[in-house]
Amino acid sequence: MQLNVNDAQAIEVSELTFGGEFNETLVHQAVVAYMAGGRQGSKQQKTRSDVRGGGKRPWRQKGTGRARAGTIRSPIWRGGGTTFAARPQDHTQKLNKKMYRAALRSILAELVRTDRLVVVQDFAVEAPKTKDLLNKLTGMGLTDVLIVSDAVDQNLYLAARNLPHVDVRDVQGSDPVSLIAYDKVLITVSAVKKFEELLG
């Protein structure tokens, strides 16, 4: 199949990588697994046994007329422990490499099908100036965009860093969430070839 390139000839690309069907279930699974892997999972609360104190019973078992109490750190008491306290846990979900690659292929194919993939011969800025990059993107009609190249250009990265709806990634750093999060994906021809190598 062919992909149109801005201000250049169309290029021949793999049907497998850029022309497959959209597998929504697989993409959802990949996105959930990716986001779960980003969770810190370090939250921790104290149960009744973790809270300092509470060794001596507040009053004797019988004869006071009050309800029985064995410790001042009971979850019922103010200053007591938490009933079902959160514990540190690993949230990562296993996703096979073949499934992950298939999900990326599915996303790329859907970007092509919905005209959200903009292919350019090359994309760079001469100096790390946000204004220059903004003018360049505005001229192309792009406001909410992910820029993907085969290797991140330092000037481009610095210029895009302060723009809230613009991100710069290389092919290796592209993930399912970033590829679907933006209105458009601006990709260089060399990055297209790199995707074909990785996912083909």
UniProtKB/Swiss-Prot annotation:
Species name: Pseudomonas syringae pv. tomato (strain ATCC BAA-871 / DC3000)
Annotated gene: rplD
Compositional bias ranges of the Basic residues kind: 54-65
UniProt GO molecular function: rRNA binding; structural constituent of ribosome
Gene3D superfamilies: 3.40.1370.10
UniProt-annotated stretches for the region Disordered: 38-68
Source lineage: Bacteria, Pseudomonadati, Pseudomonadota, Gammaproteobacteria, Pseudomonadales
Listed SUPFAM superfamilies: Ribosomal protein L4
Protein name stated in the entry: Large ribosomal subunit protein uL4
Superkingdom of origin organism: Bacteria
